[in-house]
A protein has these predicted regions:
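Actinobacteria-biased recognition of intrinsically disordered, low-complexity terminal regions
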Residues: 1-26, 208-232
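Domain-level signal for Mg2+-assisted phosphodiester chemistry and nucleotide/NA-binding surfaces
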Residues: 2-124
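Nuclease catalytic cores that cleave nucleic-acid phosphodiester bonds
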Residues: 95-231
Length: 232
């Protein structure tokens, strides 16, 4: 019996040979996509104007929450590498670069990648860029996707398709503007104000304990049509 034959005889099943090439699988991403133009508009409508420092989202707190969520997903998949990816997509209006630069640099300083696109007309929004990036990461391997946006027209169908494939899909935003996500049977909704530390002070959202003298409408959490679905 040759030395090679003897080695094969005593090989342990399931244990790779010392000389064999070990191929590591690519890490799966927990992808966060922040739709800055959309959320800026939504926050402005809640505040009735531009946010002060107390009401601007804290991306360091959001990043810590994403890391915690990633760790939870990784704990259930010990055989797969899971990595977080935090991204912000924004438009840069002509002449606003100097104003926006400190914000962009602050985002990059806490680990967020920023996709910035010139805003030259109504067709130069970043919706298609966000969807393309989600599709790219899905092809490479997604552990979960989290989209911070109220734009159901752009995101509902692709996110529900991802969720149906078995990948958790979350929508982050303000419940006043996210009835489409709340009504979905496949998407999970997280209100940004429920994430610890994202806002330094409570947002002035209208509730029963904060009604104006003239009264106010309290919008439904989900559309009436959701009564026709299984999720009531």
């Amino acid at each position: 019996m040759s030395v090679m034959e003897e080695a094969e005889q005593f090989a342990v099943p399931g244990v790779p040979d010392a000389g064999a090439e070990v191929v590591e699988s690519a890490p799966q991403r927990v992808l966060l996509v922040w739709d800055a133009p959309n959320l800026d508009m939504g926050l402005g409508s809640i505040l009735g104007g531009r946010p002060t420092a107390a009401h601007r989202p804290r991306f360091d707190a959001l990043g810590r929450w994403l890391l915690s969520r990633t760790a939870g997903l990784a704990a259930g998949r010990p055989d797969i590498a899971v990595e977080p990816e935090a991204t912000v997509f924004t438009n840069i209006a002509p002449g606003s670069a100097d104003v926006v630069r400190p914000w962009v640099e602050a985002l990059r300083n806490v680990g967020f990648a920023v996709f910035a696109k010139p805003k030259v007309d109504d067709t130069s929004d970043v919706d298609s860029d966000m969807l393309a990036h989600i599709a790219l990461r899905r092809d490479e391997g997604l552990a979960a996707v989290l989209v911070a946006s109220a734009d159901g027209q752009a995101f509902r169908a692709p996110l529900e398709d991802i969720a149906r494939s078995g990948v958790p899909a979350y929508v982050l935003g303000f419940r006043e503007h996210a009835s489409w996500a709340l009504a979905s049977d496949t998407l999970e909704f997280v209100d940004l104000e429920d994430i610890p530390g994202v806002f330094r002070e409570p947002l002035p959202r209208i509730g029963l304990d904060s009604l104006p003298e003239q009264g106010a409408w309290l919008q439904p959490f989900r559309p009436l049509s959701s009564l026709l679905t299984s999720r009531v």
